[in-house]
């Protein structure tokens, strides 16, 4: 049997035509063709001549030059050039196989809309989503609901997103997560481009290095896989594990470079660090976990600063560390850890060493030691002792062990001395060469003689909590956009009821 209606041809074994209703039903080996652009086969078809809607059922197979579709029940709307199905369907185009429980095909737009258990299978990637719009000419997919993209070197999770399947790049939002290059990257918005080996994230981002057991957070970040590097700014903070304790590092900009086994972290501009027993600040920081080295560095002084800065000005600019009650500054500070146990092992300060500790028994007294070079050792991750050499000077308040009455202020110089610590504060001082000095009654020592040249107590700069690592500039609410894109206008028009 054959029926021709306004450009559509239906062939079948049996046919029933209802002229009053302008309705046609074909049964058995049905073939529906529309010019040379569409061919459909099925077991039965019902066709309404008024609405030009065909309902095909049973082993439905629709072919077009750029795709084919298989399902059990398919509605074909010839007026709106649209096909839709409520039964599981499979679409195959030149590059991919797409499956879903429900779907729509907009022929003029060359667009698919899939809903419920959507899958795109491609030799290079797989896409799973609750709902997906796919444009065949541009190879672009728009994702809605829980979605997952798995490529050869990456995995993306999101609840909203755009994915260019030809170029393997996209923008992902709402609980977006990227697994890439042994890292887990999260952010309110993620951008990823496989060909460039590049990823970017903005707002509430975190980068977890699964091999080095470290985390970097911030509000903007970029990852360059070929260069083995990542850059994080806007409230940037790194968390590294040292001796089963978290070391928090904040700076304006954090840069992680190098392969996993030789990862180096650099921090720039207003660095602040926080650990349970250590606090610190510096202009910049260098951390190499492969050799257990952390350096706190200062920005080189300008020629004008060199000419006009006092020793106190220099000490204000120098890196500073606080170990419990002790403040230590110097031109460069180094912390060294055991690479096997990750426990702190030693401390080095080169140039302008200055140690200050508030005297707990006097109102305004400070224990002070300064010199040229410091070498310190840790015991069970606590600072145990330090040796200071080169032009060493000391101001120290001495007390009677029995009644804790002040004996006087010891003001001494020598070539080298050793300090031992107990319970987080100076416990004993040993002069390693003959000292030169005296003990003065406090009232006989003028106040300006009770502090060494260059003295500056920087306790107001000491961070006590994670929030103290940040300042007003870090509380900025404006964050950079990665790339803007718009979803198709019909985002919410596809529902189950629309196909009943």
Where are these regions (language model features)?
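N-terminal amphipathic/hydrophobic interface segments
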Residues: 1-500
């Amino acid at each position: 049997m054959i029926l021709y209606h306004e450009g559509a041809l239906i062939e079948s074994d049996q046919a029933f035509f209802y002229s009053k209703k302008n309705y046609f039903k074909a049964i058995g080996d049905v073939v529906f063709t529309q010019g040379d652009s569409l061919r459909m086969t099925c077991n039965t078809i019902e066709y309404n001549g008024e609405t030009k809607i065909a309902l095909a059922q049973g082993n439905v197979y629709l072919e077009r030059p750029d795709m084919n579709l298989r399902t059990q029940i398919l509605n074909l709307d010839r007026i709106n050039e649209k096909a839709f199905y409520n039964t599981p369907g499979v679409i195959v185009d030149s590059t991919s196989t797409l499956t879903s429980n429900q779907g729509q095909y907009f022929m003029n737009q060359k667009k698919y809309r899939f809903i419920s258990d959507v899958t795109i299978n491609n030799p290079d990637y797989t896409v799973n989503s609750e709902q997906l719009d796919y444009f065949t000419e541009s190879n672009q997919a728009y994702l809605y609901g829980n979605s997952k993209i798995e490529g050869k070197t990456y995995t993306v999770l999101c609840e909203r997103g755009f994915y260019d399947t030809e170029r393997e790049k996209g923008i992902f939002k709402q609980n977006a997560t990227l697994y890439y290059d042994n890292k887990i990257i999260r952010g309110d918005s993620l951008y990823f481009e496989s060909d460039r080996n590049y990823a970017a994230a903005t707002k509430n981002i975190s980068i977890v290095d699964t091999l080095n057991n470290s985390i970097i957070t911030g509000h903007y970040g970029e990852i360059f896989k070929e260069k083995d590097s990542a850059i994080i700014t806007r409230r940037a903070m790194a968390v590294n594990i040292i001796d089963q304790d978290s070391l928090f590092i904040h700076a304006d900009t954090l840069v992680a470079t190098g392969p996993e086994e030789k990862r180096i972290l650099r921090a720039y501009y207003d660095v602040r660090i926080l650990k349970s027993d250590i606090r610190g600040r510096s202009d910049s920081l260098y951390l190499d976990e492969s050799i257990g080295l952390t350096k706190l560095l200062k920005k080189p002084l300008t020629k004008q600063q060199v000419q006009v800065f006092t020793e106190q000005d220099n000490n204000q600019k120098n890196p500073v560390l606080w170990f419990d009650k002790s403040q230590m500054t110097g031109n460069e500070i180094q912390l060294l850890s055991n690479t096997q146990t990750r426990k702190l092992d030693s401390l080095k300060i080169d140039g302008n060493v200055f140690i200050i500790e508030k005297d707990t028994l006097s109102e305004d007294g400070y224990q002070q030691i300064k010199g040229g070079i410091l070498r310190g050792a840790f015991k069970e991750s606590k600072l145990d002792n330090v040796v200071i050499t080169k032009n060493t000077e000391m101001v120290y308040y001495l007390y009677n062990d029995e009644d804790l009455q002040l004996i006087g202020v010891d003001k001494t110089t020598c070539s080298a001395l050793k300090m031992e610590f107990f319970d987080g504060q100076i416990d004993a001082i040993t002069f390693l060469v003959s000292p030169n000095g005296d003990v003065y009654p406090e009232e006989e020592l003028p106040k300006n003689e009770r502090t060494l040249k260059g003295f500056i107590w920087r306790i107001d700069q000491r961070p006590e909590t994670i929030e103290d690592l940040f300042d007003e500039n870090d509380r900025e609410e404006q964050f950079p956009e990665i790339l803007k894109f718009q979803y198709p206008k019909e985002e919410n028009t596809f529902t189950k009821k629309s196909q009943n």
